[in-house]
Amino acid sequence: MAVPDGGTTSAAYTRRLAARSGARWKRLLDVQAPYRWNLHRLLGERRTLDVGCGIGRNLAHLPAGSVGVDHNATSVQVCRDAGLQAFTSDEFLGQEGRPQYQGLLAAHLIEHLPEGEAAAVLAPYVPFLEPDAVVVLICPQERGFASDPTHTVFVDQPALAALAEELGLRIQRQYSFPLPRRAGKLFTYNEFVTVARR
């Protein structure tokens, strides 16, 4: 599995995301159901800023008024074509005013960033959060990390905790989902989840 030319900013990367999420067996089995349930449990009806929204897999199931942001313009267009509100990073950060959100989701974003750059990427979005907003950070465990050539740095719970603290957030909870932590070496879709508050 090769890294698409242009990495995660390329149209090829968007096509790869669409092909992976559109696999017939995944749709028939609704493999995303437990992950949607988990996000709803964590974010409830909060208007959420989905940073690194990709093609909108999570954004499509977030509450009304939620917005996606991604650095890949092709992925943002896929979201818009699906009726979702999404912006490129430059569009969102360059807008007039500062809309406020009650939640922020960064799911499967941080592991794609160059080592040490996660705080710099996420920090500009923190001022868009209301006081006490919920922040959810999600990264793959070992097997999931190895499944994508665009993953650059393995981010575990201590690294997520350090990132949250660097962003000035208060950590509420950290856990493995959907299976216990030891499954992360075998199950591609096991995730590290960190929940924090602004």
Question: Residue ranges of each PLM-predicted region?
Answer:
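Conserved beta-strand signature within the Rossmann-like core of class I S-adenosyl-L-methionine
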Residues: 132-140
